Amino acid sequence: SPETIDLCLGYSNGLNAYIEDHGLIEDDIYPISGKDIIAGTMHKTPFFFQLPLFLGDLYFKKPSEIPPYYKRSDEIEKIKGSNVYALSPKITDKGNTILGINSHQPFEGELAWYEAHINSKEGWNMIGGLFPGSPVVLVGHNENLGWGHTVNRPDILDIYELEVNPNDENQYKFNGKWEDFESFEVIIKIKTIGKLKHKHKQMAYWSKHGPVIKGVNSTYAVRYSNMNNLLAIEQWYKMNKANNFKDWKNAIETLSVPMFNTGYADKEGNIYYVYGAKTPKRNTKYDWQKVLPGNTSETLWSEYELFENLPQVLNPESGFIQNCNSTPFQTTIGPENPSSENFNSNYGIETHMTNRALRAIETIGKDKKISYDEFINYKFDLNYSDNSIMAFLVKRAISILNENNKSEFDIDLKNQIINTLTKWNLSTERNNIYATLPIIAFNPLLDNSEDEIYDDLIIKRLVYASEYLLKHYNKIDVKWGDVNRIIRGDLNLPLDGGPDIARAIYYKEYKNGQKKAIAGDCYVLIANWNKNGKVSSQSIHQYG
């Protein structure tokens, strides 16, 4: 729309003014245009449905080696996660409506959140989180309503193997005929030393499906939802300016943003959840989790399922909704939960529950009257659920060690490990001396299902964790906060929380046996509408 174009132009003009005022002019990026802002959004969105990981593999791997999706152990996946909660007046002690927005992104870099409060005096009054380059707030609230997103994993990306003409590498077979690839030359600028850049010319190819990757083992094409849709910023802009649920829902129904779980609350006491997915209408005779044949129009989709057919929950009797990168089929408690039986398996909808989602159900879901302070405590909950993968791993490890007569550990160390695991109460409080060993051991396995975890792998991880702690601390019962650290400049402080905890912390190796927090609870905003509809909110950044 003209309004969105003006918005992007105004934002780019502001960036250019900043560049000029601060003497930061770089010929490669200056001047920034409104088109650059739109292109940036189109470039960043596919990061959330794993396109960069697929592209990296397509150059080298065979079709049978391409996974249907990537797990959190993969580097990009470690940074993605979020929690969103909404509580209606039915379960709050003062009849207020609470929205909890809790994004898990990197603490630093281009995908780190920053906060802005925009008040145009012309009907746009919004506060929340956004990424550098975004002209709109992506998660947050205005006077009347608010929302948060969490990353979901709908199947909105397909990979095709193309049959290339053995006599002409610039043709591929489609419906029995040889079709020419569209081709054009692109110039790629490669940074070398300092500000020096090398210009590399490369031919780019396109099939009826989308962009083509000529790999070592095969030639692939990629197709994903909204590949040519420029309207993501417009959708978010309309959500920013909406004054009521109807207007807001009209904006999100466009699905110009092709994914994300979204939790919503407003001053009228409405709460709402939707599993956002611009899901293609696909031929059910094919397995869409695998690489597809690109030689037939049967696999070439062009239409999408309707928004009204997505999993969603509006004003449940339980008075709350949550999503913590988990299945939409346990959004709340009670009969209003969507049923998996009503949705096509081609949608790729998740069925798993993260620990964060389990704990939300176990805390918020069991409390009939919740104060604001109690909600804050639930949001910063430090425990693994008894039904979590972590709890399963600990129980299984104890059982294996009690049954195992192998010599991975000497008898004293084996007994120490059993004692540590047995005494752990599943808390990640910083002074807990029993948490450190199992967290270091089992963190890489938390995205696995129980049937993917083998006894030998559990023992291997315990060997690693015990050797790590003995090397750096000369014992295995180390305070979790001595290892789990937040580091900023000269400050180096102990942290509560951990992987897949409501108070989420993800880390990397630092030094002297410490782990440096690099992602997790990076932006937390709690919006609170009182029973008269007046809003107040609190927010905090990862560094305070």
Indicate where each model-derived feature is located:
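Active-site-adjacent "gating/activation" loops or surface patches in catalytic cores
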Residues: 77-79, 90-97, 101-112, 213-231, ...
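NTP-handling and nucleic-acid-processing catalytic cores
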Residues: 70-158
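Acidic, low-complexity N-terminal propeptides/linkers enriched in Ser/Thr/Asp/Gly that mediate export
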Residues: 3-100, 105-106, 267-272, 278-281, ...
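Hydrophobic alpha-helical segments
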Residues: 257-367, 428, 441, 446
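Glycine- and hydrophobic-rich flexible loops that cap the catalytic core of alpha/beta enzyme folds
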Residues: 79, 120-132, 140-145, 149-296
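Solvent-exposed, acidic/flexible segments
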Residues: 1-12, 102, 238-245, 346-357, ...
